[in-house]
Amino acid sequence: MSWYIHRFKPFIDHNFRTLPDREHTFIGGSSMGGLMSLYALLQYNDVFSRAAALSPSIWVSPEKLSGLVGRANLAPGTVLYMDYGSREMGNHEGMRRGFAEMCSKVLTRGIHLTSRIVPGGTHSEASWEKQLPFMFHTLMYEVEE
């Protein structure tokens, strides 16, 4: 993530017409990319104001992620869209419980969260594509503090 923050983003901001400030800098991804997007929002909240984490692999290290949520230095107006599909893994009950715990933890920090369990959703690009309208709606709406 350091390379992304210190090399890639400055390159993009220098070579393309962007609004490089935090308020206009979002990140998103699916699966491990969803986990990295959640991590980036928490660890680099001075860079990213909003993130989309589609089917984030929070099961990889839930304790470390929960700790990061608890200690992250978050600015007001931080927004997160997070979802997963009901048909993603064999242990839906465990996934649902872990997802709910992460959502609860995020909400305690004042993050504006939109979370969804997608009925019939799978761990696939075809399923994630169908979530784009929900994701963009969340990332683009005005936040009322």
Where do the protein language model's features map onto the residues?
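Non-catalytic cap/lid and distal C-terminal segments of serine-dependent acyl enzymes
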Residues: 1-145
